[in-house]
Structure formats: C-alpha cells, structure tokens
Design a protein with these regions (language model features):
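Repetitive helical segments and hydrophobic/amphipathic motifs
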Residues: 12-13
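Bacterial N-terminal signal peptides that target proteins for export
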Residues: 1-9
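Contiguous, structured surface segment used for ligand recognition
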Residues: 22-142
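C-terminal motif of bacterial Sec signal peptides marking the signal peptidase cleavage site
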Residues: 18-20
C-alpha cells in the first residue's frame, strides 16, 4: 500500500480536547499505520464533537454516503453522540470529499480547525483511510 499523504493541522490538540463535555481528559492513540508522510500542527482551537455535529459528503456519491454513515455509527458507539449525516459540503462539521489523484488514490489529507474537519481523499478509499486516522484521534472511553 502506498504511503498516505496528510496534513494534520491541530489533530493532536483536537484529539485531547475533542469532547469538551468531559471532565476527565483521555489520551488518544496516534499509532497510525502506515506512518504519515507529513504532520503539520497548526494554530487555533480544537474541533468539538457533539450531538448533532454534521458529517457532510458530496451529494449523489453513494460510496461517500457509506463512509459518512460509517463514521457516524462509530462515533455513536464510542461516545453516545448522534451525528447528522447530510448530503452537501457547506457549513460547520466534518466534511468528506474526493479530489481524484491517480498517483495516490488511497492518499488523503486531514485538516482540523475549530469549526471544521476536512478529510480529502484521492478516492473514496482514501477518504475511508482518513476516517480511520480521525477515529484514532478520538480518545477512548469518551
């Protein structure tokens, strides 16, 4: 499998502060395989994952809808928070998108800011791998 391209702006801070409702901070696992080619820590606040957070995907893309539902189901199981899976790409929340990249179809970028998480993959499979990395950043037991 080819190495994954990603830029993880603020991911570590997001992982530690992902759930603002918790009084106890749990550590996230960052044992990501394959090892990212690049990690960039950015400035700014952490993204807060809460009930009603939107998981957005491009309208009409069934594979991306399945990716979005997979993420929402995982978060529900782990945290009890119910995420909204919606077609569209505008607004705050988690945005899943594809920018075709024949050279690295399984590559992805993961960018985290205070109001949005963007997973941009070279294909739907790349987005899926980005979701796996995001899952690793959610502290266990939240």
């Amino acid at each position: 499998m080819k190495k994954k391209m990603m830029s993880l702006a603020g991911l570590f801070a997001a992982g530690l502060m992902l759930f603002s409702c918790s009084s106890e901070v749990k550590e996230a696992s960052y044992q990501i395989i394959p090892i990212p080619q690049e990690i960039v820590l950015g400035q700014g606040g952490a993204f807060t994952l809460a009930n009603g957070t939107k998981v957005m995907y491009p309208e009409g893309n069934e594979k991306m809808q399945k990716n979005a539902q997979f993420l929402a189901d995982y978060v529900k199981e782990l945290t009890g928070n119910t995420l909204q899976v919606v077609a569209g790409t505008e607004g705050k929340g988690i945005l899943l998108q594809v920018t075709p990249n024949e050279a690295q179809p399984e590559g992805y970028q993961l960018k985290v800011s205070a109001d949005k998480v963007v997973i941009n993959g070279g294909s739907e499979a790349g987005v899926f791998y980005g979701i796996q990395t995001l899952r690793k950043s959610i502290p266990a037991g939240q």
